[in-house]
């Protein structure tokens, strides 16, 4: 079973509390999502592969370590996942970025996939799927399904807020996928929203309804 890690760093929890507030503006919400994603990256990227590289200091030549950035991919689930990309890219700017587009059918609460655009060598990359919310788990499961159909095998899911129902569903569907979240909330309501949650992350990121 993949691990579930709730990142309880004080800075992340402080910013997440502001993010949840109803009166947080679109501008502030967007900035906070970016900042939290970057802060989460410290733990999410802890086990990145390293490679030897020869460099020259002012004193001598030496072999040191660097991240094998060409073997990473960040894949946001559109549209809300876009808000988390830059925060992680600021830490690993050489990573490639793919996109998986989905929307939720408001009657069935099931995700519908409308776009998959990935690096050609996605099967050779360590992949970080990002989406602010892990609610029912439907979108996350479908995204991982799409990646595995294309040969991907090393996949991590990163979100800001999660529900126990979504975590359970993703773990059961894909037990090899690690989950990183900033908060594990109480439950889902009848409309499939996380409680207490933070509302619709996509609408709050882009100022839509």
From Swiss-Prot:
The keyword Cell inner membrane does not apply. This is Uracil phosphoribosyltransferase. Uracil binds at residues 194, 199-201. Binds 1 Mg(2+) ion per subunit. The magnesium is bound as Mg-PRPP. The gene is upp. It catalyses: UMP + diphosphate = 5-phospho-alpha-D-ribose 1-diphosphate + uracil. Its cofactor is Mg(2+). It is an enzyme of class 2 (transferase). InterPro entries: PRibTrfase_dom, PRTase-like, Upp_B, UPRTase/APRTase, Ura_phspho_trans. Belongs to the UPRTase family. Allosterically activated by GTP. GO terms for molecular function: GTP binding; magnesium ion binding; uracil phosphoribosyltransferase activity. 5-phospho-alpha-D-ribose 1-diphosphate binds at residues 79, 104, 131-139, 200. The keyword Ligase does not apply.
